[in-house]
Amino acid sequence: MKKKPRRTRRPIAAPATPAKKNLLDSLGVSEVDYKDISRLRTFISDRGKIRSRRVTGLTVQQQRQIATAIKNAREMALLPYPASRPQ
């Protein structure tokens, strides 16, 4: 019987995009404050939605802090709620 040729594994490709920089670390922020609107706006899209971790490069704990701060700022009417879709 004839032996089957061995398959070799494909080389592992490098990631297509470089790792995102952590925005909070680059800003030098240790605590997130809901009153700091200018910093919180960097984590909100133009429609008012909270940007995902994939986009911002934050850790899980930092993303939770940002989300809580944005929600508190919305309650205090410092930031807008997400805009509804135009019809």
UniProtKB/Swiss-Prot annotation:
- Enumerate the UniProt keywords alphabetically: Ribonucleoprotein, Ribosomal protein, RNA-binding, rRNA-binding
One term under GO cellular component: cytosolic small ribosomal subunit
| One GO molecular-function entry | structural constituent of ribosome
Domain of life, source organism? Bacteria
Pfam families, sorted: Ribosomal_S18
What the entry lists under InterPro entries is as follows: Ribosomal_bS18 (IPR001648), Ribosomal_bS18_CS (IPR018275), Ribosomal_bS18_sf (IPR036870)
Please provide the Gene Ontology terms (biological process) for this protein: translation
Entry's HAMAP family?
Answer: Ribosomal_bS18
Q: Which family does it belong to?
A: Belongs to the bacterial ribosomal protein bS18 family.
* UniProt subunit comment: Part of the 30S ribosomal subunit. Forms a tight heterodimer with protein bS6.
Stated role: Binds as a heterodimer with protein bS6 to the central domain of the 16S rRNA, where it helps stabilize the platform of the 30S subunit.
Q: What is this protein called?
A: Small ribosomal subunit protein bS18B
Upper taxonomic lineage? Bacteria, Bacillati, Actinomycetota, Actinomycetes, Mycobacteriales
**Gene of this entry:** rpsR2
